[in-house]
Amino acid sequence: MPAPLFLSGPCEICGQKTSGRHFGVLSCRSCAAFFRRSATWSRKKVQCVKGTCKIFEDGKFNCKQCRLKKCVEVGMDSKKFQTNRDLISSCSVPQSLCNFLGRPEFILCCEPDKASVFKTTIDVTYLVDMAKNLLEKDPCQCPLSNSLEQLSTTLENMRGMKLNKETQIIKKLGKNESLKTWEQGFLRAVEWFSNFSEFRELDENLKMEILKTCWVSWIRLDKLSETANKRVNATLDNSLLMVGNDSCMHMNDYEVDLSWCTNYSLEQLAFFFLTPDDEKNYRQLIQDMVDLNPSSTEISYMLLQLSLEHAGKRLQGDILEATESLVQAQANQLHDYYAKKLKLSNYSSRLTQLMKITRTLEADMRLRIEKKKVADVFNIFKIQFSHPEMFETT
């Protein structure tokens, strides 16, 4: 018959109220935890000069050495320490295909025989030439006070031109559809920037380098904001996403054909394309813009801030200096828009919500660049572009 448990009475070390038996001695939790920490101290460390210190007095413990000595004298035993009782430390790593094969998820299905060492080059020089021609044209003459208002009017005009056109639903995303939407997106961004007076004053090479780097981030925000705007006006179903000029697609009901750009299947490359997290983020961004319902002026500033900061961080040097100057000038004009036109004395909360959207897209751009690097290392894609910097975030 086991010995009875005596769980009441004072702690045998310090005299405080006990909490049970610890390491063979009736003690409080404090003394038990102390002994667990100090049982491995060296003999030299546990020697006290006085040797007769009072363990607990005036609400505090006075001498660690005498306290440890008392623990040993009353019978605390370090051999009674219990280990491997922590569920976290004792559980094994959940088995998965990644653990079993010893390969990270993003290269789980990487098959060397499907790698594409020799690639087909897609020449997009004609797009660069078209962009140069657009930048050489005279901008729209609008009697507006600043460039942010000019860009806002340009955006409204670009979207207004499509009001009477029927929106086409893309059910299959293959080579033709991808190249077409990329071409439309790039030229759309160039057209918008061509009406940005301060941007037109930059050196020709700087302008083209910025456009080639930032157009993807620009068009992504443009399409998300256009989708949100159409939902607010009840002209687009909630399951649809704008992807091109007058074209959209169901976010959960479309076919993807990758045979033109890789030897791998869509299932094998799920990591590189629209993952469930990506879709969730896009839906949330659209809903945030529906709730905020930003004006064309606010959208124009967001487009500038997102695209120019992305280009500046990627290219550095003179381009970073130029983009920072452009963004700062437009920030001042946005302040005037809030303070003078809308008569808002406190707009920081709204601006924070708008910038949260651009920060989310910035993070998405960085992730896409890292994925592209992984794809290049393993030769996942069998195509390349004559101007690769234009497509590192597609």
Swiss-Prot record:
One of its GO terms (cellular component) is nucleus. Residues 126-394 form the NR LBD domain. InterPro entries: C.elegans_Orphan_NR (IPR051152), HNF4-like_DBD (IPR049636), NHR-like_dom_sf (IPR035500), Nucl_hrmn_rcpt_lig-bd (IPR000536), Znf_hrmn_rcpt (IPR001628), Znf_NHR/GATA (IPR013088). Belongs to the nuclear hormone receptor family. It comes from Caenorhabditis elegans. This is Nuclear hormone receptor family member nhr-103. Orphan nuclear receptor. Keywords: DNA-binding, Metal-binding, Nucleus, Receptor, Transcription, Transcription regulation, Zinc, Zinc-finger.
